[in-house]
Amino acid sequence: MTPARIDPDRVYLDHAATTPLRPEALEAMLPLLTDGFANPSGGHAESRRARVTLDDARDLIAELLGAAPGEVVLTSGGTEANDLAVHGGWEAVAADRLPEAHPPALVCAAMEHHAVLRSCRALAVRRGVELREVPSGPDGRIDLEALATACRGDVGLVSIMAVNNEVGTVQPLGEVAHTLSLGSPGAVLHTDAVQAVPWLDVAAATAAAGLVSISAHKFGGPKGSGALVVRAGSRVRPRIEGGGQERGRRSGTPNVAGAVGMAAALAAAT
């Protein structure tokens, strides 16, 4: 098999699609791909060491994102994090409603990444949820008046991206959160912050959001690693059942090397 390599005579500028692996991430990951490969969910000495390594990576990710370690759910990337936020976040809110109650509405920006937009549309069809897609203005910023209208009544979840993946518009998440608090204070705000790192101080920019998605390969980390921050006061119901990893929110054997690489890249990028 011939490896895909970047032509040395060309300049790679497509960093919004993916980034080269940072040397810091590669160096941190290599020992875990050869010697430190144990399953951190096990009970023997090697597993315990792997668990310490995983916990250290989670602690660093949490610190850099302005979260507590227990709020960081490790995922396979931004798409899974967004899917868990949309489906899991909405389901957690809906579960608090009476069985006979009408399901709470779902709100998102019409310019969301497909990982959010298609998740919202799929949820709307599967659960009979009213989906309200909010337009943006000529500059790509969310129309706050239209958002205020969309957030009236019983809304379960609102998803507005932090930075647009096509044109780079930075959304006013503080104003979005304020608008949401006036119209439907019981709703959860999710933001897809995949394109925000390393260009913004993500901890500050997303402080108003209850759910925050990131993806390692957008800031020099490995592909196949991401995270969803579930801040205190917000909840998600799992999309993947199994061994109960990630505090029951995302089952599956943890990708220790991926988490370590993501933590190293995030530290280098911020």
Task: Briefly describe each language-model feature range.
Residues 1-270:
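Pyridoxal 5′-phosphate
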